[in-house]
Every structure is written in C-alpha cells, then in structure tokens.
Amino acid sequence: MKVGIYPGSFDPITNGHIDIIKRASEIYDRVIVSVMQNPNKNPMFTLGERVALIEQIIQPYSNIEVDCFSGLLIDYAREKGAKVIIKGLRAVSDFEYELQMALMNRKLCPEVETVFLMTNSQYSYLSSSLVKEVAKFKGDVSEFVPEIVLQAMSKKS
C-alpha cells in the first residue's frame, strides 16, 4: 500500500490545500493529512479545530484521513509507515525552501521520498496567511476557503 503524508499547519485550510489533497488521493492508496503544531505561529484555529474542519471536508473520501503531529516530520512518516511526503508548490520561492527540506529529510531518512505537486494555477497565489490577512480587514475570502471554514472564520472575528 502506497501511503503519502501531506503535512501543514492548515490555519486555515484553503481550496489550494484541498486541491492538492484530492489529487494526491488519486495517486496514493492512503493519504494522511498531517496537521502540525507550529510553535513559531500564532494560530487562528486550535489544533483540534483544524483537525475537525479537515475531517468534515475529507469525509467523502475513503482513502484520506487526518491526524496531527509535532516533532520531526520524518519520524512521524516512519511511525505511519509512509514512504512519501507530499508537498504542494505555488511558485519558485516555494521550491527553494521545500527543496532544502526535502534534501534534509532524505539525509535523515533515505527511504522516504518527497513528491512535489504543482498547485492548480487558480490557486497559485493563495496561502493561509493571505486568507487570514484579508479576513482580518473584513475582506471577502469566500472563494478561497470552503463554506465550513468561512463560517468558522466568521466566528473568530
């Protein structure tokens, strides 16, 4: 069974993330959306809230699950029996950072590969940070996130 892990903070999960998740689910037998606790970020949603939102979004897909982790991603991948880390790329600037991470992960654990999926061009500018910034100033983010996330965000502001 081919297992892929799609890690991220997903704060909030965007339509760009969902596009990558759906496409990965067509390639891998099992996809684990792995929500990480990032101590360097001040999240809009708690870890539990992010997991709950993603669980509702992925409900129609039998081969996608959601989990959370902290620590080294490569250790988590080993623990889950995953041989692939899935990363979405929006721009060249994403590639530079993600390549460094992929090379470090390969050095730490050569049996786990990193696979890059190019973001659909309609989402190439989209990031959770930008969605939060627009929402902070009462801008309309309805085309960037699923309805359930939009509702959850409106309760936070």
Swiss-Prot record:
Pfam families: CTP_transf_like. Pathway: Cofactor biosynthesis; coenzyme A biosynthesis; CoA from (R)-pantothenate: step 4/5. InterPro entries: Cyt_trans-like (IPR004821), PPAT (IPR001980), Rossmann-like_a/b/a_fold (IPR014729). Substrate binds at residues 9, 41, 73, 87. ATP binds at residues 9-10, 17, 88-90, 98, 123-129. The keyword Nucleotidyltransferase applies. Its cofactor is Mg(2+). The keyword Nucleotidyltransferase applies. It is found in: Cytoplasm. SUPFAM superfamilies: Nucleotidylyl transferase (SSF52374). Keywords: ATP-binding, Coenzyme A biosynthesis, Cytoplasm, Magnesium, Nucleotide-binding, Nucleotidyltransferase, Transferase. Signal peptide: none annotated. One of its GO terms (biological process) is coenzyme A biosynthetic process. The record marks 17 as: Transition state stabilizer. Homohexamer. HAMAP family: PPAT_bact (MF_00151). Reversibly transfers an adenylyl group from ATP to 4'-phosphopantetheine, yielding dephospho-CoA (dPCoA) and pyrophosphate. This is Phosphopantetheine adenylyltransferase. It comes from Alkaliphilus metalliredigens (strain QYMF).
